[in-house]
Amino acid sequence: MNRKNHYHFIGIGGIGMSALAHILLDRGYSVSGSDLNQGITIDKLIAKGAAYLPGHKESYVPEEGTIIYGSGIAKDNVEYKEALRKQLPLVHRAELLALLMQEQTSILVSGSHGKTTVSSLITAIFQTAKKDPSYAIGGLNSQYLNGYSGSSEYFIAEADESDGSLKHYFPKVAVVTNLDNEHLSNFEGSKEKLAQTIEEFTRKVDDPNLCFYNGDCQELKGRISGISYGFSQECALYIYSHRQEGWRSVFSLSFLGKDYLDIDLNLIGKHNVANAAAAIGVALTFGIDEESIREALKSFSGVQRRMERKNTSEKFLFLEDYAHHPSEISCTLRALRDAVGLRRIIAICQPHRFSRLLYCLEEFFNAFQDADEVILTDVYSAGEMPLDLPSPEKLAETISLSSHVCCTYVPYDNVIEHLKQNIRVHDVCISLGAGNIHTVGNALKDFEPKKLSVGVVCGGQSCEHDVSLLSARNVVQYLSPQHYDVQYFVINRQGLWSQVANLDAGSDYNSKNYHVLSSKIAEALANLDFVLPILHGPFGEDGTLQGFLEIANKPYGGPSLLFSAISMDKIMTKRLAASVGVPVVPYQPLTLPTWKRTPELCMRRILETFTFPMFVKTAHLGSSIGVFEVHNETELKAKISEAFLYDTDVFIEESRLGSREIEVSCLGDACSCYYISEPHERRGSKGFIGYEEKYGFNGKSSATIQYDLNLSEESKTRVKELTERVYRVIQGKGSCRIDFFLDREGNFWLSEMNPIPGMTKSSPFLHDFARLGWTFEQIVHQLIIAGLHKFDQKKKVSSTFNKQCLLTAKS
């Protein structure tokens, strides 16, 4: 290539074209280019010395030089036609890339999905290892660059399979990420022809040990001779463990007889773990040291339009992603779900090309299962003519039914306003598409959703009224004023409600009390966006209030109706826990009618089963309420009678005095995303920890909480596993604390559950999650997020059911 030559690009702002323009400029060539719009990509080229010409005009074509065009440039383009008239050399983008790579060690990445990420990861590793590679990548890095000419022999580039340009390349190293029904319109609709093209490309690699392919992709198996990578055991580069930790991935793999443990990747999603594995394989093949590989992956800054954050608000998150094929959409949403947990995901999808939508229609309908809501907007045609496809409204309806989400069609021009009206605090929005959907995120960069109106309900009719107030006073200080407008409701011991200005100690909560159905209270509750009950005992955490809020159609925090009711029934809890193999303390249930009719028979059965001391416990009260330690028959009979004053059901339980009390906290939805804390221990002065000692009432020293336990890792793992079993079998939703006894032999026995555990300053629930690295504010956020999720799931099922009924009726 003659360095005196001038290169003119028709469409210089395109991602592939601009990368090559960068390389030419870095190598000292003169470059000009035209495009319809000027953005950051062209600004970077101008800064290097390129001449930018807006729009397309015949006069832009130089008298001498080489004209570069891409597959997207139509043959009737005025500059293309003028170049033909002037008989100037016309070179396709792919041909220029092949020329630029001549006499260099070319590392080319091809495949239907993931090319940009894999090539970017390889580049990052080589840069960290000080190899200074050249690169041409289909996405902008953190410096807004996609092309660069380095000083070394290495040249890393994407090899686009979509337009037949693979024939121009002769790679030293090849990576094939996968093969899908993508770009089939360029292969006469034949996936087989696409596969043959990929196969021919890999055959150009002289050494099979320099050809890497995805061994989990069925379409590639048996076609390619090389090094397979993936999650299957038969892969030569075998990823044998992976997990996602928030916005990062951690994985381990084996390659060439060596294990590489706990690699930290600054990307999310199983698909990106596979992408990173391919990059690792290439790097190791070239002898790059493990330390450089690990550092590059850990600090990888990502690629723009790949899970890129677009907004500044801390109340919600707006991401942009290039995913536009159903497989990409599905993988992206799955990774996002694992990162954000129970937060509502709103996917804004702009289908890209009518032909892709037609070829992938069935997959498209099922691609959104990890979203909560989908906004479907108009197809970005990319120059194609419309095809015979269902209407946008019909597409949205089918997505709703197939992906089990609420999907709504919104015309492109209305999307921004629709989002402004519907985005809620804690939402995660993600735009999906390769067209101009990125404008939505730009428009919402500084948008702030309105704060949630949260009503804190506390007090209650139970004997734990005072503890509820203490818990509420502690929790409300962590309700962020940037996220929430908070109102306070106190229920007195008679069940009457009052709305108060604050929960300060010494406030008079009894001056203006109303029935919950009074207009004053009902109207105040109706205006709330969310209710946060912080109530202990009957009428608070037993499903009663939860049922009322369900009827009122209000989202609420803490346990669900069913979970509350079961958890506060200690007998039912024991039965369900035992059904999944969780050891429960031996017990014998007793009902009031049975006790009234046959007290002697009841006593005889108890004495035949248990020895003194034993415990009499109420079935539906708190963990330390209505619990009596008895030592003889007289005490037993008296305390059973007393227990029936507080509850309709009681049970006798074998004593576990001398055992340690180990407790574990839970938060989230047991059916999807939940968190289990590390165990803590509650220690009293002696024996059973009663209500007064538990909370330090009436002058008693409160029981102490020990977080750094003298327990083996095996025991800690065991109690957490038992906790998880209990939480899942009772379908935990919201929050709870699960209590166990640990006997002298090292056996754990389920004691009980507390669906709304104490949250006072000294209570362990908040501290349990704080010790996992959360702030108290984040924990309270999570209580609200879990409540919103619980409400959204029920609403989604209800709306889908009603819609399906309507469709059935119409048919």
Swiss-Prot record:
Enzyme class, spelled out: ligase
Cofactor note: Binds 2 magnesium or manganese ions per subunit.
Record: residues binding ATP: 111-117, 607-662
The keyword Ligase is assigned to this record: yes
One Pfam family of this chain: Dala_Dala_lig_N
Region D-alanine--D-alanine ligase: start-end pairs: 451-811
Gene Ontology molecular function: any one: D-alanine-D-alanine ligase activity
Region UDP-N-acetylmuramate--alanine ligase: start-end pairs: 1-450
Binding site for Mg(2+) 2: E752, N754
Protein name: Bifunctional enzyme MurC/Ddl
Organism of provenance: Chlamydia caviae (strain ATCC VR-813 / DSM 19441 / 03DC25 / GPIC) (Chlamydophila caviae)
Lineage start: Bacteria, Pseudomonadati, Chlamydiota, Chlamydiia, Chlamydiales
